[in-house]
Amino acid sequence: MQQLFLKIVLIYKKQEGNLNAYSFWEKAYFDVYSTLLKNAHPITGLVYAWTNFEGKDPQNCYYEVTGSGTYNSYQYDACRTPWRITMDYVWFGNEQARDYLQRISRFVQAPIYAQYDSKGTIWYGGGGIQNIVDSYWTNGLRRINPDYADWGHRHAIAFVGSFALASMATNQSNVDICMNELSTLQALRYYESSLGLLYSLLASGNFWNPL
């Protein structure tokens, strides 16, 4: 939620006429997007769960991934990213947010098989919102853990819902497909239940801009 908090602080500081504070928080707000875009895969838009300021592997800092996979994969920490960026887009109309959401929505809609960009770099599509699973490497390849049946297999609301919200930056037809899929899912755990509620509030227009 960092970018939303920073945006709200920005608006309040501007209204107060505190230009020094406004400049400080404005830089912080855009730095969040800078880090996000440095780390995001150039085609899929998928991001690490944890990264450093330059969008690279984290060093000399603490990160906890034992409950959901590796720091450099799109797992249960990272899956919240499209939801957060969607909130910035629908509340404030941020163009960087829109562009990012459109990129990650293209990943969701792309065929699931291996594909290559103009430089010969391999990547994989999500296969449509109905085929989204609960763990990926950032190039779109499913991250399947053979010792734990959940990862890379479950059609989990934590992932599906966040991607569904990202569709709000695309077109109505895609939104309808994604939201219909979201409406069919039930959460199995506390974490997913919490995210499912938050996703549904935003999808239904009940997660209001506080300003």
Model feature map: region roles:
Residues P82-W91, S162, A166-L211:
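Terminal, non-catalytic domain-edge segments
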Residues M1-G161, L165-T170:
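Extended ligand-binding clefts on enzyme/binding-domain cores
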